[in-house]
Amino acid sequence: VISSSLPLTDESAIFFCQDTDNVALFKFMVIPNEDTPYKFGCFVFDVYIPPNFPNEPPVVNHSTSRKNNFRFNPNLYACGKVCLSLLGTWSGQSASEKWIPPNTAGTGSTLFQVIMSIYSMVFSEDPWYNEPGRERSIENAKINAEALQYNKGVQNGTIKYAIINQLKYPEEGFEDVIKIHFSQKKEKVQQYLQELNKTTDLNTFNTLI
């Protein structure tokens, strides 16, 4: 049911891979929107469903961060930790942001909600502002400059680890999806790397594709 409800468009998508030996384990891969610094990247998450689910939240780990020791986002630690109040890994400002067990009102939290929160809220256009206490300000040039600089770092990490490395060492279970994704986006990725003057990465991409 979850896999059939996930977004699948020309610009972004989520793919689901169930562990055939253990129903409590699965992966999902996010291809973020192209208006974000994560464009064209393939980001994989490991999920464990605990015995007490849905009374307690699932355990989610960002495989792409963990394997490359790179922090893609204030919510995605280099160790793989996914920091979200919905997962109980961050203390949210209100009870509504936290995991809600099933109830008679039918307002309990769901696994689909977790996946979509990561897809839409974590992989945002300006991830620097995901850090609590950082607020957008048109008038504050220093803050805006820091956000732009952060985006450049995210772009570099995405190219190195979520594009090039995914072509070199595709995540198990998503090999075919990754291959098709980059084949379909070949010209767009090439143009993107050219615009960023990433000559070495462009040559590597052309060799791998």
Locate each region found by the language model:
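Short, solvent-exposed secondary-structure capping/transition elements
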Residues: 39, 54-58, 126-132
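Residues in well-ordered beta-strands of folded domains
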Residues: 17, 29-31, 61-63, 85
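Proline-anchored loop/turn motifs at beta-strand termini and strand-loop-strand connectors
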Residues: 47-54
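N-terminal BTB/POZ boundary and linker segment
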Residues: 21-23, 28, 32-35, 45
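Short, solvent-exposed loop/turn segments at the edges of secondary structure
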Residues: 23, 40, 55, 77-79
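N-terminal leader/pro-regions and domain N-caps
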Residues: 1-26
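Domain-scale recognition of soluble eukaryotic interaction modules
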Residues: 1, 62-209
